[in-house]
């Protein structure tokens, strides 16, 4: 039996808080075909602050809470229907982003903030691809290009701003939590 330490408790607490932060950011919504939310902002910030396992566990917990029906997704929705619906690919894409970031972190132990931000932008592109493909397969309308135009192009400038904001507040937050 594993001995629980302060670090285990801290990890669990941080993962729970990060999952809650994603949920709260998902509730801040502007309705559209694919709703505009602050989820990606929370994901960006979590991936900057807590690389690897903590970030991946946080996103997984968020998705599991939503899958069992808690209203943690955009529009205060929950349930497996949201995950399997037209926007489910973007939600799963957040997990893919975290897994990619963890993998990159294992390969490149010391990444500068600039490298981290470039990695996040590339990981977001993978999320866009995953979500657009899912949306296209779900709706069956148009082609992948049409799905990309509907699901990604309107979000590029806003998501770029979210990434800049997450980067801007990274250092002050990192400084405050570095002692825990």
Predicted region positions:
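Hydrophobic transmembrane alpha-helices
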Residues: 1-56
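Interfacial aromatic-anchored transmembrane helix boundaries in multi-pass membrane proteins
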Residues: 26-35, 63-97
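Alpha-helical transmembrane segments and their lipid-water interface positions
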Residues: 58-62, 70-73, 97, 101, ...
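Helix-loop junctions at the membrane-solvent interface of multi-pass transporters
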Residues: 28, 49, 75-76, 104-108, ...
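Hydrophobic alpha-helical transmembrane segments
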Residues: 12-17, 41-45, 55-61, 87-92, ...
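Short helix-perturbing small/polar motifs within transmembrane alpha-helices
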Residues: 2, 10, 17, 24, ...
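Membrane-embedded alpha-helical hairpins and interfacial helices in multi-pass inner-membrane proteins
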Residues: 76, 109-180
């Amino acid at each position: 039996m594993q001995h629980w330490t302060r670090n285990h408790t801290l990890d669990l607490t941080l993962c729970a808080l990060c999952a809650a932060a994603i949920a709260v950011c998902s509730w801040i919504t502007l309705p559209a075909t694919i709703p505009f939310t602050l989820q990606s902002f929370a994901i960006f910030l979590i991936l900057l602050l807590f690389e690897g396992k903590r970030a991946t566990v946080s996103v997984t917990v968020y998705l599991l809470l939503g899958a069992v029906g808690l209203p943690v997704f955009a529009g205060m929705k929950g349930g497996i229907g949201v995950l399997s619906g037209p926007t489910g690919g973007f939600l799963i894409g957040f997990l893919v982003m975290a897994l990619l970031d963890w993998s990159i972190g294992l390969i490149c132990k010391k990444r500068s903030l600039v490298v981290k931000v470039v990695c996040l932008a590339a990981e977001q592109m993978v999320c866009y691809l995953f979500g657009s493909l899912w949306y296209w397969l779900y709706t069956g309308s148009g082609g992948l290009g049409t799905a990309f135009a509907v699901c990604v192009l309107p979000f590029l400038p806003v998501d770029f701003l979210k990434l800049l904001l997450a980067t801007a507040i990274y250092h002050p937050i990192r400084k405050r939590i570095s002692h825990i």
